[in-house]
Amino acid sequence: MSYKKLEIWRLSRELVIEVHNMTFLHPKFEQFEEAQQIRRSMKSVKSNIVEGYGRRRYKQDFIRFLIFSIASLDETIDHLETLSETGSLKDSRLSENLHQKMTLLSKKMISFLRSVEANHNEFPPN
């Protein structure tokens, strides 16, 4: 099995693309501040899923990287809220749509983490 078959990876990949595209809607001064931060934190969500999956042979490593990924998603949600609250992201429907998708991903990631904690042996090393 490949990490690309994980639903949490697929959802995070979609969000990386959506967040990346959303950041070009911001004023120029935000391109190098909050917009850059939200792109990085969202990419970190996906990357930590991949790295954790690559270390799935070692239960604690797998869990640690999933926790890093969840923390990065929390950071991303905070950046999204900041962009909305400061008026840098003016499209409230886009903001709400992204927030809903991130919240759904968060729930799925927590569920996946619990599954790994309880059933680690079901994840073959290769």
Label each residue range with its predicted role:
Residues 1-126:
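Amphipathic alpha-helical assembly/interaction segments
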